[in-house]
Amino acid sequence: MNTAIKPLVLLLIGGATTAAQAAAPGDEVIPVKKSTLVNLVDLLVQRGVLKPDEGQGLVRAAEQEAAETQAAQVKSNEAKAATSTAEDAGEPANSAPKTGKTKHVGYVPEFVKKEIRDQVRAELKAEVLQDVKQDAKTEGWGIPAALPEWVAAIHPSFDMRVRFADEFYGKENAGGIANAGLDAAGNFFGPYNWLAINRLANSPQGGLQRQVSQNPNEAIVNNQIDRLRLRERFRLGFEANLSDGLKAGVRFATSNLNNPVSNDQTLGNTGQSYQFAIDRAYLRYDYLDERKTSWFSLYAGRIINPFLSTDVVFDPDLSFEGVAGSVRLPFNRGTSKLAGYKAPNPTARFGINQGQQTPDSLFLTLGVFPLQDIDVSVNDKWLYAGQVGADWLVWHDSRLNLAASYYEFQNVNARRNPIGSHVYDWTAPQFVQKGNSMVAITDDQTLNGVCDDTVGCLFGLASRFKVFNATAMFDYAGFDPVHVLLTADYAKNLGYNQQKILTEFANGVVNYTDSRPRTTAYQIRADIGQVEVRHFGDWSVNLAYRYVQRDAVLDAFTDSIFHLGGTNAKGWVIGTQYGLSKYAWLNLRWLSTDAIDGPKYSIDTVNVDLNARF
């Protein structure tokens, strides 16, 4: 600001001083005293407009110019006096009368002129350059001519996360490797790695008890020794606009190929390469009317979670395979309430999915998703899902989401093999975490001679899963840009049948001492801060309490961080996010959880995530 004002100030001072000192007594010029000039210069120096050496130089220059002007004026007056008599005597009768006034032109020092020229040139150059850059960006100079049209339609995305995961186990935890998977009463507890046990089910090493005794590090999940891991996730995606409303997308990601709820790669594979997989591959069609309002969306392939939900039911990293469609009935379209409103990223808050909906609409979403392909098609495992809800922009940017969902998982529950048969081996789960009630598909009664374990050799889920889920989210924007998001989530498994389990399976539930229905889950959560952490200094904090009984939801798809994955857990979650730059932010979460049923099993988990994206 000072550099822009300074040349003008110097010009005013120089011009005013010179004019005042050179003026004749009859001129209409206000004389400026030397003391006034000095005081003015001192004031400008104090205000920071001029530097001290510039002020002193200005005063000296003004004094010198005044002296020279005064000397010149004296000589001019003497010359006029010497010639005045002759001029008066010989003046023609028709000559013009003299006014007695002299015109003066203010003198501007050269250094002031130079500074003005340099300042104007620099400011003009900056303004022109900025205008050119803006026009080039807006009009896309050079791109249409240099690249094919289809290239300009492709939009890349990238994100990367490095995680420090520290896990602290309760010192009084029961079971575990040290106790051979037994609780204090000698009951089988584990916690067991069911996938590792099932892999050897039909081999000479098969059987839970044999696996526990011969290979405890694989058969039993660690729940006593603290652990620190460094993990990394890398994702690279592309989405292409093929035509009006039609898009195609693909996303590559680091991945544990056998884990659908985590894209994390644990560091420590020196000499080996990371697993890199296609995490998403899909087509999406949006029907738009003449107002560009989206009434209908159709997804096919390996797609994003299309449902309004939380990580109580579905982990944030979970992708859905199949077909889904969403129909929206807009309301309040005749008002200006939606003008200027931009819906935030629906997954910006970790663990929350606000759905692929638009504000001020009623919606219905249906989906059919194959979970596992079996040789005989009637035995394929499926997820049939439906959701109805409302998305309401209440006032300004405050938004209310309500949804009721029903998720039916077909053919995921275990069936006991007939004697001497493997016919129901396919009912063993392809992936589980921990928590759901387990039963023996094969035991010493069904395949005596092949399986001699009294507990069992091959295990599956005891319960059917028909999950009702109700979710409510209210995003209050009264403190904008700080928002307050309140979330309530409730889930109930309607498919659990205790009598059927006890009738079909002789040993009943093998990982709990009872088979009573434990089928309820809920979460209460509050988020305070910016909706999206996208710039330096942006922040967000959250606090949640979660309670998930063992058969409330399918443990394979629920959050993989809370209680280190699975169900039968309750506890608190505290988290914060802070923006480090436009493309980087820090995420810190602390989770403290305990088992609801069974022997004591406590875990404290700390995750520190460094994230980057563009």
Annotated model-derived regions:
Residues 20-220, 345:
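N-terminal periplasmic/intermembrane-space "pro-region" immediately following the signal or transit peptide
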Residues 153-155, 225-412, 519, 523-557:
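Outer membrane beta-barrel
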Residues 1-21:
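Gram-negative bacterial Sec-dependent N-terminal signal peptides
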Residues 23-24, 53, 126-157, 166-173, ...:
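Secretion/assembly modules of Gram-negative surface proteins
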Residues 165-195, 331-344, 411-432:
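Internal, charge-rich low-complexity segments
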Residues 222, 421-614:
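Outer-membrane beta-barrel pore domains
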Residues 164-292, 307-315, 455, 493-517, ...:
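Surface-exposed loop and membrane-interface regions of Gram-negative outer-membrane beta-barrel proteins
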Residues 141-147, 200-229, 348-361, 443-463, ...:
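Intrinsically disordered, low-complexity acidic Ser/Thr-rich regulatory segments
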